[in-house]
């Protein structure tokens, strides 16, 4: 796991050196808020005071921009989402018919999160392996992923709550995205 790899890096570092840990992309947004706190707290427990955690986060923006990014015109996100069913078919012996599902991106403005769903185009029964069957009604969805969007002050607050201080943030204003340098205290 990521934390196991971090523990190994800490064990290998030379005495007296600081550690720089990268968590790029916007993966932190894929954690439920309580899990994000737990994850950063776990990282902080592994790091020493003065070590640096560099994290990327997608920032809050207009709903239309978020939806456009996750329901893109070339269908890349839809293909990625449908690939989850293809993998379940391949790896778990399921019989999802991919053409019977449509990709949907929904933005929950209260939670500041985008949700990926696969909507059933028909009433259907799907077998997963030999022992499990799932009944889906037309219009029913499978919620496959969430991605929370942050404000810069959310990251600073999260840092303080988990034993870090946010020293600096770099923000791309064109497509609001932040790189934050958090120092373990």
Language-model features and meaning:
Residues 16-26:
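Short SAM/SAH-binding signature in class I
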Residues 120-121, 171-185:
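Core SAM-dependent methyltransferase catalytic element
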Residues 165-169:
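A short linear hydrophobic-aromatic micro-motif
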């Amino acid at each position: 796991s990521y934390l196991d790899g971090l523990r190994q890096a800490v064990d290998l570092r030379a005495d007296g050196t600081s550690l720089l840990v990268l968590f790029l992309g916007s993966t932190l947004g894929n954690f439920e808020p309580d899990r994000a706190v737990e994850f950063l707290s776990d990282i902080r427990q592994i790091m020493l005071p003065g070590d640096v955690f560099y994290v990327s986060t997608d920032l809050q923006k207009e709903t239309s921009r978020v939806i456009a990014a996750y329901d893109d015109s070339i269908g890349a996100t839809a293909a990625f989402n449908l690939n989850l069913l293809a993998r379940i078919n391949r790896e778990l012996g399921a019989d999802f018919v991919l053409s019977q599902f449509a990709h949907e991106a929904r933005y929950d403005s209260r939670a500041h999160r985008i949700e990926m769903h696969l909507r059933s185009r028909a009433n259907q029964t799907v077998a997963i392996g030999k022992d499990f069957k799932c009944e889906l009604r037309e219009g029913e969805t499978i919620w496959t992923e969430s991605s929370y969007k942050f404000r810069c002050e959310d990251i600073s607050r999260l840092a303080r709550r988990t034993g870090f201080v946010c020293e600096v943030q770099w923000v791309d204003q064109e497509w609001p995205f932040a790189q934050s340098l958090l120092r373990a205290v």
